[in-house]
Swiss-Prot record:
It is an enzyme of class 2 (transferase). Synthesizes alpha-1,4-glucan chains using ADP-glucose. Belongs to the glycosyltransferase 1 family. Bacterial/plant glycogen synthase subfamily. This is Glycogen synthase. It holds the Pfam family Glyco_transf_5.
Length: 460
């Protein structure tokens, strides 16, 4: 099958959220399975620092009265062909910025559609989030090209219809009041990144005002769990952590804890409970809940806590203020740093993820992969990936809570803090998480089955 992934992000070149990990990993697995899979993404101004891009384009076109160029290269450390959409709107050195994102990504989507019609013609265009949402609309009457639309986060729905009608060709038959709604209606298949999230977005609590539409298209809605690149994220050979280890040499992991404590200025003590969090600092990730319990938890325990991420200025400021009250025990790192995030996964005892909603979540998978015990709220993909820890029967992979309430989060954190004292059970809990198989191979089989059903191909 010929499949083109269209996305605003792709690891390791351009990443803000989990969408980048999906687009950077899934095509590689599908290609190894014998399919002609390629990626189409913007030519951001910073890409030249990360890879070599040919000076001459392979194709030129016009979209929304704008000329653009297509450059062909290869996704780093893979054999996946990569098409870069070249236009001055994407030359600034940030993925998302300013007030013209709606225009920039509508142009990008239009350029991708033009390339599919007149350049390299796939059998399936796999679109990702609102940035590519107009592609299924434009391709609705192209019978030999099918479209898949993956919802990574329903909260971000793109520009409204009146705006699209003003800036570009918007078919008269387009339905839906924004890009996300239109994509969901016109795509041949719609996927979300976990089975639980696929069910939740059909309810008012999680549907972001599209729950009725999601229920209406339930026949073509699929929840396929995300995976992780088990080779790219592997504590046995990760060059970004001080000490490599695996499930059979878990005793070596403490060296990473000590190194992390030294790096952020904590007291070096292997017996201290070290908790970490790598996240966007936004309400979705449970920051409002954390602000209600973190100060009290830090005051009544000797926990060490490191937070990595950026987001809303309010949450950044509040976290800084709490950290200032616990010098040497709490560190707030307001930046994007993949190397530091890996050291947090490899060095912390527990990983905090109290999300209000979570389509799938990658961080909890990486935490378990590296032996950090997740503390999560049971929502979306966190339900599908982290099983409740029962110390009596010694089963489960993490600490979890159901209600989005401060007391429930605090209880889960205290349970983890107390559980850390029982070293043998804690190590068994770590090993169970590290043995979990969240590779893309299993997820890829689900996508292949769906692709074949779209094209009328028999399942092998």
């Amino acid at each position: 099958m010929r499949i083109l992934f269209v996305s605003a992000e792709a690891t390791p070149l351009a990443k803000v959220g989990g969408m980048a990990d999906v687009v950077g990993a899934l095509p590689k697995v599908l290609r190894k399975m014998g399919h002609d899979v390629r990626i189409f993404m913007p030519y951001y101004g910073f890409l030249g620092d990360k890879m070599e891009v040919p000076e001459e384009p392979i194709w030129e076109g016009t979209a929304m009265y704008q000329n653009f160029k297509i450059y062909e290269t290869v996704l780093p450390k893979s054999d996946v062909p990569l098409y870069l959409f070249g236009h001055p709107a994407f030359w600034p050195r940030h993925i998302y910025y300013g007030d013209d994102e709606d225009w920039r990504f509508t142009l990008f989507a239009n350029g991708a559609a033009e390339f599919c019609w007149n350049g390299w013609k796939p059998e399936i265009v796999h679109c990702n989030d609102w940035h590519t949402g107009m592609i299924p609309v434009w391709m609705h009457e192209t019978p030999d090209i099918k479209t898949v639309f993956t919802i990574h986060n329903l909260a971000y729905q793109g520009p409204w219809r009146w705006y699209l009608e003003r800036i570009t060709w918007c078919p008269w038959y387009m339905e839906g009041h924004n890009t996300m709604a239109a994509a969901v209606q016109f795509a041949d298949r719609v996927t979300t990144v976990s089975p639980t999230y696929a069910s939740q977005i059909q309810t008012p609590a999680y549907g972001e005002n599209l729950d009725g539409l999601m229920s209406f298209i339930t026949g073509k809605l699929h929840g396929i769990l995300n995976g992780i690149d088990m080779n790219f994220y592997n504590p046995a050979n990760d060059r970004y952590i001080p000490q490599t280890y695996d499930v059979n040499t878990l005793e070596k992991r403490v060296d990473n804890k000590i190194a992390l404590q030294e790096e952020v200025g904590f007291e070096v003590n292997k017996n201290s409970f070290l908790m970490g969090m790598v996240s966007r600092l936004v309400e979705q990730k449970g920051l409002d809940l954390m602000l209600q319990v973190l100060d009290r938890f830090m005051a009544y325990t000797d926990t060490q806590f490191i937070l990595l991420g950026t987001g809303d200025r309010f949450y950044e400021t509040q976290m800084w203020q709490i950290a200032s009250r616990y010098p040497g025990r709490m560190s707030v790192q307001l930046l994007h740093n993949d190397a530091l995030s890996r050291r947090i996964y490899a060095g912390t005892d527990a990983f905090l993820m109290p999300s209000r909603f979570e389509p799938c979540g990658i961080s909890q998978l990486l935490a378990m992969r590296y032996g950090s015990i997740p503390i999560v709220r049971r929502t979306g993909g966190l339900v599908d990936t982290v099983s409740f820890y029962d110390p009596i029967n010694n089963v489960g992979t993490g600490y979890s809570f159901d209600r989005y309430e401060p007391l429930d989060l605090l209880t889960a954190m205290v349970r983890a803090y107390e559980g850390f004292r029982f070293k043998d059970q804690w190590q068994e809990l770590q090993k169970r998480g590290m043995r979990e198989n969240f590779s893309w191979d299993k997820s890829a089989q689900g996508y292949i089955k769906m692709y074949k059903s779209m094209l009328g191909l028999p399942e092998e």
